[in-house]
């Protein structure tokens, strides 16, 4: 009975994100990274994609795994479920837009910014991230809105020991069961802002930011 309830709740979450109840279908196994060209949109139509662990990676914390999706500058990824194994999730080479993407079991990372730009994440969710969900390996901005995350290490992490500027914003989201912090940096010039967000079991919202570089308003702890 408990297992059935869990399945029903999971199906309800997917339905609420994509607007329809998905038909039962085997996940698409990705053998080589799917490249979304510059300025184009990839619409997964609610399908589930998993990495071939032999070619992309097993979704562990091992370094140098390959992404399931690679987005070139200005590309958009939407209506996608990334299952397990997720390898290294999504790589953005410059600005990218992520809409209604769900990571069921985050691999090495859910998404990494590899070249400077702005990452806009709207809707979607991420679960079971042993370490971080979104990794910023280049200067830029990450805007997260209407997002759900649970059982994670950190939501956003700037690459450790780097000093470039990253602007992080989180709005109207729900974050729970965090091991470390929602936003973390080692840079004295990076900024973090959290607004209108519900959170539970979060040790600290911000970590490593310089004085005056963080702000919050309208948030609720539950």
UniProtKB/Swiss-Prot annotation:
| Pathways involved | Glycan metabolism; pectin degradation; 2-dehydro-3-deoxy-D-gluconate from pectin: step 2/5
Localization terms from the record:
Secreted
Query: Record's Gene3D superfamilies?
Result: Single-stranded right-handed beta-helix, Pectin lyase-like (2.160.20.10)
**The organism's place on the tree of life at top rank:** Bacteria
Q: Which reaction does it catalyse?
A: Eliminative cleavage of (1->4)-alpha-D-galacturonan to give oligosaccharides with 4-deoxy-alpha-D-galact-4-enuronosyl groups at their non-reducing ends; Eliminative cleavage of (1->4)-alpha-D-galacturonan methyl ester to give oligosaccharides with 4-deoxy-6-O-methyl-alpha-D-galact-4-enuronosyl groups at their non-reducing ends
| Gene Ontology terms: biological process | pectin catabolic process
Enzyme Commission number(s): 4.2.2.2, 4.2.2.10
Q: How is its activity regulated?
A: Strongly inhibited by Ba(2+). To a lesser extent, is also inhibited by Sn(2+), Mg(2+) and Ag(+). Inhibited by EDTA in vitro.
Cofactor(s) this protein requires: Ca(2+)
- Which range is the signal sequence, renumbered to this chain? 1-25
The protein's GO terms of the molecular function aspect are: metal ion binding; pectate lyase activity; pectin lyase activity
Q: Which Pfam families match?
A: Pectate_lyase
pH-dependence annotation: Optimum pH is 10. Is stable for 1 hour at 40 degrees Celsius in the pH range 4.0-8.0.
Q: How is the cofactor bound?
A: Binds 1 Ca(2+) ion per subunit.
Q: What family, per the record? A: Belongs to the polysaccharide lyase 3 family.
Q: What does this protein do?
A: Catalyzes the depolymerization of both polygalacturonate and pectins of methyl esterification degree from 22 to 89%, with an endo mode of action. In contrast to the majority of pectate lyases, displays high activity on highly methylated pectins. Is not able to cleave trigalacturonate. Does not degrade xylans and carboxymethylcellulose (CMC).
- What's the protein name? Pectate lyase A
